[in-house]
Amino acid sequence: MRTTYMAKPGEIDRKWYVVDATDVPLGRLSTVVASILRGKNKPTFTPNVDTGDNVIVINASKVALTGKKAERKIYYHHTAYAGGLKERTAGDFLAKEPTKLIETSVKGMLPHNSLGHKMGLKLHVYAGAEHTQQAQKPEVLDITNLI
């Protein structure tokens, strides 16, 4: 009888990928990155085990916001004080904190539990073209054929 393969945390080979966000639409970039973080690109994918790889996103400040999302898309957060609902547009978010914009978008596409939090820790976003993970020897991932 055949049984379904279930990955174990010790058996997982993790790779490092570098993704260039220059002129890539935010949503398309986020879906590809979230899929890699979950491990859905591997034949050993198991939903209840973190089988994903590490992803480095560079040039976050050059990500594309299509249409009128820069003015019309609004991100909300609450300060936990009365009347503390804050809002900012995607354009302001991109101008002031481009790394946080991509992190927010990708983490919203991961599971909302402790496993999703562990997956989110493998995401490294940089506003410029330089990153500090050269020691891991990351592979350059061209996402134009994945989107």
From Swiss-Prot:
Cysteine-cysteine disulfides: none
Pfam families: Ribosomal_L13
Keyword Ion transport appears in the UniProt entry: no
Keyword list, A-Z: Ribonucleoprotein, Ribosomal protein
GO cellular component terms listed in the entry, alphabetical order: cytosolic large ribosomal subunit
The protein's assembly and partners: Part of the 50S ribosomal subunit.
Protein name as annotated: Large ribosomal subunit protein uL13
Native source organism of the sequence: Lactiplantibacillus plantarum (strain ATCC BAA-793 / NCIMB 8826 / WCFS1) (Lactobacillus plantarum)
Lineage: Bacteria, Bacillati, Bacillota, Bacilli, Lactobacillales
